[in-house]
């Protein structure tokens, strides 16, 4: 790691700059990038799914949001790396600018950062007289490796997607002066009904597209199993050349998924507008909801098998449980995991996104075990669920915290909402049930929920307390409700259930997709109201009827 930092400092000096931002993303801006291709991981050793780092002449700064504070502290070498712990409401841009001096120059790798991020950064940096400089190639990436060839791409049937790719193309009805630009692999997967499961924790083919009213041009190095009038397929390497040739058009694009490198190829005669594909894919078709109900039912069965294994007499490590959960998903028909399973026992359960299940950390009597998992089944839409289990008999503190988190979920799920309910409302209702634990050292330092779709973290919606997320729900949005409490070095509890918006008007209704029972041994029923006990009894009875309980 020290050699990489030294090389980067020499690179910065050669560019007459003062710092460089090293990213965790790949050149498709994917959320989950495997560690061998994760440049940020190679520099700091931090394995979280998000969080870039800044290398300067005298320091290395690792940005970590609330999910990763404890994990980053454990993984980085503090003799080399300083962890910048973002607080809720702050942004990575603020953290970046805070560590840079006035009149300094920051290098960004243009194909690893979104255009929208760069525009905001440039505006805020200008106030501090900080210059932003762009390079096209990541200085520490192995460019010799072609990452996107020889992968299998499959088409999801209309019984799940409702419309074929050709039908979606025809329904677009673009104007003569409009071009739809698709740079986000998840948007591409949605629009084409194509999936690729060769990359870990992803179902989206690595491809981009340029669409007009009579042509659908795909840019990829994968074999595409589609054929219809107007479809053309090109090598991925030619995408920017085609993009640069577009003139005097209204380009519809998801600006948050357009890399700065792609943006730099767009001629100034064009006008950029929002494509809204990200909103379309969030409103699931009824056929997709039917599939998700089936996929979550199978995910529930995986957790039942995990419960049985934990409560067997076997000596088990976290890694044993990690291997088991992958096996159980395969047994239930999953083609892959939608994210790396989190198996966190004992004090590790306080690490919100604990990433490395240990073969040395044995499960002991009284340990709580937090399991956060999900899979991709035949429909290529993610599942996501979290349960906290216990081995043997828990102490009173574990029961109190678990019950507190359970009460927060019940409150949010059963509340009568108005038709104008926002994403922010969901978070605020959940959060008000947990903040009084701050005084005891237990923190709820992540958002209440996220959208779920082809990617396990889909936007929209995002259920956060920030005013930017005071936006209305739409019918058939799928999202998580996942209250949690975590005390560093002690324990953590998270209970995550996926729901979908059954209706917005005249009444706002949500319905659960995951039905796995809660851990009775961790519930202090004396802390529940009568209505909460009634809800819990009905929930647990459903589990018994569906063979999810012992």
Language-model segment annotations:
Residues 1-550:
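Active-site neighborhoods and metal-handling regions in enzymes and metal-associated proteins
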């Amino acid at each position: 790691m020290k050699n990489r930092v030294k090389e980067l400092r020499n690179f910065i000096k050669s560019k007459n700059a003062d710092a460089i931002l090293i990213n965790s993303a790949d050149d498709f801006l994917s959320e989950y990038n495997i560690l061998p291709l994760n440049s940020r991981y190679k520099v700091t050793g931090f394995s979280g799914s998000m969080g870039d780092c800044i290398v300067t002449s005298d320091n290395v700064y690792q940005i970590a949001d609330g999910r990763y504070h404890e994990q980053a502290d454990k993984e980085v070498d503090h003799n080399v790396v300083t962890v910048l712990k973002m607080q809720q409401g702050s942004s990575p841009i603020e953290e970046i600018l805070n560590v840079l001096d006035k009149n300094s120059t920051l290098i960004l790798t243009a194909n690893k950062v979104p255009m929208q991020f760069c525009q905001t950064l440039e505006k805020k940096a200008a106030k501090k007289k900080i210059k932003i400089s762009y390079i096209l190639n990541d200085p520490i990436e192995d460019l010799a490796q072609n990452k996107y060839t020889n992968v299998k791409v499959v088409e999801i049937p209309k019984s799940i997607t409702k419309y074929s790719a050709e039908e979606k193309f025809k329904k677009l009805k673009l104007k003569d002066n409009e071009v739809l630009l698709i740079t986000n692999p998840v948007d591409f997967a949605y629009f084409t009904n194509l999936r690729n499961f060769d990359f870990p924790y992803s179902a989206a083919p690595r491809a981009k597209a340029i669409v007009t009213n009579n042509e659908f041009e795909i840019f990829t190095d994968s074999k595409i199993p589609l054929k219809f009038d107007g479809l053309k397929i090109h090598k991925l390497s030619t995408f920017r050349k085609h993009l640069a040739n577009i003139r005097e058009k209204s380009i519809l694009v998801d600006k948050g998924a357009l890399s700065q490198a792609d943006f730099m190829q767009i001629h100034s005669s064009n006008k950029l507008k929002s494509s809204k594909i990200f909103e379309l894919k969030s409103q699931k078709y009824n056929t997709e909801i039917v599939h998700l109900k089936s996929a979550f039912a199978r995910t529930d069965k995986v957790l039942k098998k995990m419960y049985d294994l934990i409560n067997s007499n076997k000596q088990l490590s976290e890694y044993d449980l990690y291997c088991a959960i992958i096996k159980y998903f395969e047994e239930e028909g999953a083609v892959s995991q939608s994210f790396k399973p989190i198996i966190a026992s004992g004090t590790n359960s306080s690490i919100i996104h604990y990433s490395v299940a240990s073969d040395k950390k044995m499960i002991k009597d009284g340990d709580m075990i937090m399991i956060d998992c999900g899979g991709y089944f035949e429909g290529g839409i993610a599942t996501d669920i979290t349960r906290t289990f216990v081995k043997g008999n828990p102490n009173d503190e574990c029961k109190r915290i678990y019950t507190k988190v359970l009460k927060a979920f019940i409150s949010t799920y059963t509340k009568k909402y108005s038709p104008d309910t926002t994403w922010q409302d969901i978070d605020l209702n959940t959060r008000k049930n947990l903040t009084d634990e701050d005084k005891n050292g237990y923190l709820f330092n992540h958002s209440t929920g996220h959208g779920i779709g082809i990617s396990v973290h889909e936007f929209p919606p995002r259920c956060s307390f920030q005013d930017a997320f005071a936006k209305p729900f739409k019918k058939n949005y799928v999202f998580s409700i996942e209250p949690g409490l975590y005390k560093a070095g002690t324990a953590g509890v998270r209970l995550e259930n996926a729901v979908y918006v059954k209706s917005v008007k005249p009444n706002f209704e949500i319905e659960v997709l995951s039905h796995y029972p809660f851990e009775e041994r961790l519930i202090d029923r004396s802390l529940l109201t009568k209505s909460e006990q009634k809800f819990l009894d009905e929930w647990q009875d459903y589990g018994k009827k569906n063979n999810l309980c012992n």
